[in-house]
Amino acid sequence: MARIAGVNIPTNKRVLIALQYIHGIGQKNAADILEKVKIPLDRRVNQLSDAEVLQIREVIDRDYLVEGDLRRETGMNIKRLMDLGCYRGLRHRRGLPVRGQRTHTNARTRKGPAKAIAGKKK
């Protein structure tokens, strides 16, 4: 089992799929990484040499923001919005949808489970 960016990637899968187990790397980024390192897309992780794994690791460390660093930056961006007091920050602070969705009905994912209100039943 190869370990890249602090994540154990599965050995029996294709490298293109296995790289997507790393937070911050999707299908496009995984294909770009393999293209830079010149590894065929259909090769499996257990067929990679240690040198190839090292090359992949170096490309990811150099060019991509992944795992904890990406989560930290995302959290800091949200915290910055909340500290500014802008509209998006207020919506984050109140736990409401940020991107203009309606809240009169729906938005249950963001608002949490419905609260019972006495006298609402007919």
UniProtKB/Swiss-Prot annotation:
The keyword Ribonucleoprotein applies. It comes from the Bacteria. Gene3D superfamilies: 1.10.8.50, 30s ribosomal protein s13, domain 2. The keyword RNA-binding applies. Keywords: Ribonucleoprotein, Ribosomal protein, RNA-binding, rRNA-binding, tRNA-binding. InterPro entries: Rbsml_uS13_C, Ribosomal_uS13, Ribosomal_uS13-like_H2TH, Ribosomal_uS13_bac-type, Ribosomal_uS13_CS. GO terms for cellular component: cytosol; small ribosomal subunit. GO terms for biological process: translation. Pfam families: Ribosomal_S13. GO terms for molecular function: rRNA binding; structural constituent of ribosome; tRNA binding. Residues 99-122 are annotated as: Disordered. Located at the top of the head of the 30S subunit, it contacts several helices of the 16S rRNA. In the 70S ribosome it contacts the 23S rRNA (bridge B1a) and protein L5 of the 50S subunit (bridge B1b), connecting the 2 subunits; these bridges are implicated in subunit movement. Contacts the tRNAs in the A and P-sites. Belongs to the universal ribosomal protein uS13 family. Part of the 30S ribosomal subunit. Forms a loose heterodimer with protein S19. Forms two bridges to the 50S subunit in the 70S ribosome. This is Small ribosomal subunit protein uS13. It comes from Rhodopseudomonas palustris (strain TIE-1).
